[in-house]
């Protein structure tokens, strides 16, 4: 059974005025029309759900686990939650990340989420010749990103789009090489309606591709 995991990294989880949320909802409507009844869709809202960060409790728990020591109740609780997040991620084969671009990078809760899924011997392993991703089984990743600026003009902004560079590099590292980003960009300088319409078209095409169906234009 195929499973799609939606990773909502917007601080305002259901903000109807958010461009990234609008584009995501348009994608989801299109996607649901195309997938079979056997497809499962799950969603994690990073700013509503508990997503542990790497802090002294987590570091202490990891050290104790490595030494075979007993965890405190707090350490056990946080590591169990981290394991739940990891297993949910591993159980999917298609991923959709929704985020606003803040100061050229991903939201902080998305970084915390990445720290929950980038676990040695689970999603990658160390070898004598370097690290190897363990998710090389045809998984697919779609990133929906909204931004006030434009990041595809091959200029200074392109160089500092750290969100895209980081996510693409990390998921490639884990073995997920089918990576696509849809940008609803330029909301601060372009006509918002035009930005949305362009992004809607792109996510419709992305939904079709991810559902293994293709839209053919009669005007070709």
Curated annotation (Swiss-Prot):
Binds 1 FMN per subunit. PANTHER family: FMN-DEPENDENT NADH-AZOREDUCTASE 1, FMN-DEPENDENT NADH:QUINONE OXIDOREDUCTASE. Its cofactor is FMN. Coiled coil: none annotated. Belongs to the azoreductase type 1 family. Homodimer. This is FMN-dependent NADH:quinone oxidoreductase 1. Its EC number is 1.6.5.-, 1.7.1.17. GO terms for molecular function: electron transfer activity; FMN binding; oxidoreductase activity, acting on NAD(P)H as acceptor; oxidoreductase activity, acting on NAD(P)H, quinone or similar compound as acceptor. InterPro entries: Flavodoxin_fold, Flavoprotein-like_sf, FMN-dep_NADH:Q_OxRdtase_AzoR1, NADH:quinone_OxRdtase_FMN_depd. FMN binds at residues 18-20. It catalyses: 2 a quinone + NADH + H(+) = 2 a 1,4-benzosemiquinone + NAD(+); N,N-dimethyl-1,4-phenylenediamine + anthranilate + 2 NAD(+) = 2-(4-dimethylaminophenyl)diazenylbenzoate + 2 NADH + 2 H(+). It comes from Bacillus anthracis. Transmembrane segments: none annotated. Keywords: Flavoprotein, FMN, NAD, Oxidoreductase.
């Amino acid at each position: 059974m195929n499973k799609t995991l939606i990773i909502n990294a917007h601080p305002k989880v259901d903000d109807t005025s958010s461009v990234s949320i609008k584009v995501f909802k348009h994608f989801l409507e299109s996607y649901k029309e195309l997938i079979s009844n056997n497809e499962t869709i799950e969603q994690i809202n990073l700013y509503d759900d508990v997503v542990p960060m790497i802090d002294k409790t987590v570091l202490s728990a990891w050290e104790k686990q490595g030494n075979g020591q007993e965890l405190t109740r707090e350490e056990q609780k946080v590591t169990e939650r981290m394991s739940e997040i990891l297993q949910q991620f591993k159980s999917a084969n298609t991923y959709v990340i929704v985020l606003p671009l803040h100061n050229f990078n991903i939201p902080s809760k998305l970084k915390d989420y990445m720290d929950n899924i980038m676990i040695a011997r689970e999603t990658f392993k160390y070898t004598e010749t370097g690290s190897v991703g363990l998710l090389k089984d045809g998984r697919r990743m779609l990133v929906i990103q909204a931004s006030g600026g434009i990041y595809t003009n091959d200029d200074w902004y392109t160089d500092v789009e750290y969100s895209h560079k980081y996510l693409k590099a990390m998921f490639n590292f884990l073995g997920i090489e089918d990576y696509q980003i849809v940008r609803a960009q330029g909301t601060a300088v372009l006509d918002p309606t035009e930005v949305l319409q362009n992004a809607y078209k792109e996510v419709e095409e992305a939904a079709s591709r991810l559902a293994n169906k293709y839209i053919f234009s009669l005007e070709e």
